[in-house]
Curated annotation (Swiss-Prot):
Binding annotation for a divalent metal cation: 91, 95
Organism: Conus radiatus (Rayed cone)
Any one GO CC term of the record: host cell postsynaptic membrane
Record lineage: Eukaryota, Metazoa, Spiralia, Lophotrochozoa, Mollusca
Miscellaneous comment as given in the Swiss-Prot or TrEMBL entry: Exists in two forms, due to cis-trans isomerization at 106-Tyr-Pro-107.
Residues carrying the site annotation Significant for the subtype selectivity between NR2B/GRIN2B and NR2D/GRIN2D (potent for NR2B/GRIN2B but not for NR2D/GRIN2D): 85
Effect ascribed to mutating residue 85 to I: Little decrease in potency for both NR2A and NR2B
Protein's recorded name: Conantokin-R
């Protein structure tokens, strides 16, 4: 029984020696410092984005998010403004008249 206890302690000591002492396991596979320094050397450095460059801009260089907020505020937070709704209603009425429908005519 004492033999198994000594073997158990011996195996654990050898394992800790291999892992902590040399940094390798058996066949030379690096576990600690060498591989971790290589991995950090290959990591790209973080890019710090400024607030203005992180946002998309339109062709004129204006900030799209700010423009959309202004448009929605002007429309009263509706998907379409009153002008657009009136235009679409007029177009639908013209199409219905062209088709010969007198009242709401859907395909």
């Amino acid at each position: 029984m004492q033999l198994y206890t000594y073997l158990y302690l011996l195996v654990s000591l050898v394992t800790f020696y291999l892992i902590l002492g040399t940094g390798t396991l058996g066949h030379g596979g690096a576990l600690t410092e060498r591989r971790s320094t290589d991995a950090t050397a290959l990591k790209p450095e973080p890019v710090l984005l400024q607030k203005s460059s992180a946002r998309s801009t339109d062709d004129n260089g204006n900030d799209r998010l700010t423009q959309m907020k202004r448009i929605l505020k002007k429309r009263g937070n509706k998907a379409r403004g009153e002008e657009e709704v009136a235009k679409m209603a007029a177009e639908l009425a013209r199409e219905n008249i062209a088709k010969g429908c007198k009242v709401n005519c859907y395909p």
